[in-house]
Every structure is written in C-alpha cells, then in structure tokens.
C-alpha cells in the first residue's frame, strides 16, 4: 500500500502492538479457546503486515490458510479436548520455569536494545532499476512460483518433508 509516512508508521505501531497483545494472550490466558482467538489475532496482524509491504498474495494466503483453516482446526481440537484431566497435574512454578523465563527475558531485552539502537531510516528499502522493470513484467504469484522453484527449492522441499513427517506422527498419535 502506498500510504503517507505518518499513517504507515501508525499502522506499523498499531499492528505491532496487536501482535504483542495477541502473543501475550496466547501464552498467558488460561482458557485455551481464548488463547486460540489470540492466535487468530496474531495471524491477522501478520497478514496485515504483509499487505502493508505490498505482498497481497502472501497476505491473502496467510488469511485463508492460517486464519481460515489452521486456527479453526485448533479451535475445534481445543473444544473437543477434555480440559478437566489436564488441570489436575498443574504445578504453579518450577525451577525450569524460572530458568526459561530468565533466558526469555534476556533475549527480549537484547532484541529491544537492538531494535532501539538500529537506524531504521538509514536502510535503503528500494530496489535497483533493472529489478523494477523485471518485477513489473511478472505478477506477484508468478514471482513466488519462480523463487520457489529456483532459489528456495531445497528449503521448500525440506519444509514439505517436515510437514509430511509431522502429519504421519499426528496420525500415529491419533490411532493410539
């Protein structure tokens, strides 16, 4: 989207805060249905980030696949789960939780420090002139297909193998 600078910056901050609030909701809410709705908020904010960066195809795919299918599947799985058997084994705090929270807090502080120290306006976000001419001739979905079949072929195939193994594992767990 070609928006003026202040509006674009406001939308970035608004969507970023939506991501943070949704992520905290996924982790901190005790009701799993509310956590799934918070995950939906996170996925919608990510999709809107893609549309702000002029990747409309990826934004639509994000909405259709992750929000429309995966999040609904998670909601159905959570609703069919028996929550009473999981709440019996609840311990409030362990030593591993303290170590994990310490590590996560230190990573979070280092990320915030890096983000605040970076000069974002010094980064050149434009492309070269020959890339602009090449991108105008090919559509967005064609560019994704070309990159998936050339530059990102090996990672794409590795991700498909990982998804296949996780699907086989989920079927094996469901049969038991």
From Swiss-Prot:
Query: InterPro entries, per this entry?
Result: NAD(P)H-Q_Oxidoreduct_6, NADH_UbQ/plastoQ_OxRdtase_su6, Nuo/plastoQ_OxRdtase_6_NuoJ
Give its E.C. classification number.
Answer: 7.1.1.-
Q: Which UniProt keywords apply?
A: Chloroplast, Membrane, NAD, NADP, Plastid, Plastoquinone, Quinone, Thylakoid, Translocase, Transmembrane, Transmembrane helix, Transport
Which EC class is this protein assigned?
translocase
What sections of the protein cross the membrane? 10-30, 32-52, 61-81, 92-112, 152-172
Q: Name one Pfam family in it.
A: Oxidored_q3
**Membrane topology listed for this record:** Multi-pass membrane protein
The entry's localization annotation reads:
Plastid, Chloroplast thylakoid membrane
Q: Does the keyword Amino-acid biosynthesis apply?
A: no
Q: Which reactions does this protein catalyse?
A: a plastoquinone + NADH + (n+1) H(+)(in) = a plastoquinol + NAD(+) + n H(+)(out); a plastoquinone + NADPH + (n+1) H(+)(in) = a plastoquinol + NADP(+) + n H(+)(out)
Main localization (coarse): plastid
What's a GO cellular component annotated to this UniProt protein? chloroplast thylakoid membrane
**Annotated Gene Ontology MF terms?**
NADH dehydrogenase (ubiquinone) activity; quinone binding
For this chain, the family text in UniProt reads: Belongs to the complex I subunit 6 family.
Oligomeric and partner information: NDH is composed of at least 16 different subunits, 5 of which are encoded in the nucleus.
Summary of the function given for this chain in its UniProt record: NDH shuttles electrons from NAD(P)H:plastoquinone, via FMN and iron-sulfur (Fe-S) centers, to quinones in the photosynthetic chain and possibly in a chloroplast respiratory chain. The immediate electron acceptor for the enzyme in this species is believed to be plastoquinone. Couples the redox reaction to proton translocation, and thus conserves the redox energy in a proton gradient.
Protein's name according to its UniProt entry: NAD(P)H-quinone oxidoreductase subunit 6, chloroplastic
- Native source organism of the sequence: Oenothera argillicola
Taxonomy-wise, where does this protein's organism fall, top ranks first? Answer: Eukaryota, Viridiplantae, Streptophyta, Embryophyta, Tracheophyta
């Amino acid at each position: 989207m070609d928006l003026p600078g202040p509006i674009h910056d406001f939308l970035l901050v608004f969507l970023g805060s939506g991501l943070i609030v949704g992520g905290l909701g996924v982790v901190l809410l005790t009701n799993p249905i509310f956590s799934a709705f918070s995950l939906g908020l996170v996925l919608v904010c990510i999709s809107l980030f893609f549309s702000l960066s002029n990747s409309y195809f990826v934004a639509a795919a994000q909405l259709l696949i992750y929000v429309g299918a995966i999040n609904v599947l998670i909601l159905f799985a959570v609703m069919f789960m028996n929550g009473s058997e999981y709440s019996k084994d609840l311990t409030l705090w362990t030593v591993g939780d303290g170590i994990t929270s310490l590590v996560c807090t230190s990573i979070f502080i280092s990320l915030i420090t890096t983000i605040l120290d970076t000069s974002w306006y010094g980064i050149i976000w434009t492309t070269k002139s020959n890339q602009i001419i090449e991108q105008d001739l090919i559509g967005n979905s064609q560019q994704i297909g070309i990159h998936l079949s050339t530059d990102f072929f090996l990672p794409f195939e590795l991700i498909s193998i990982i998804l296949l193994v996780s699907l086989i594992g989920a079927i094996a767990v469901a049969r038991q």
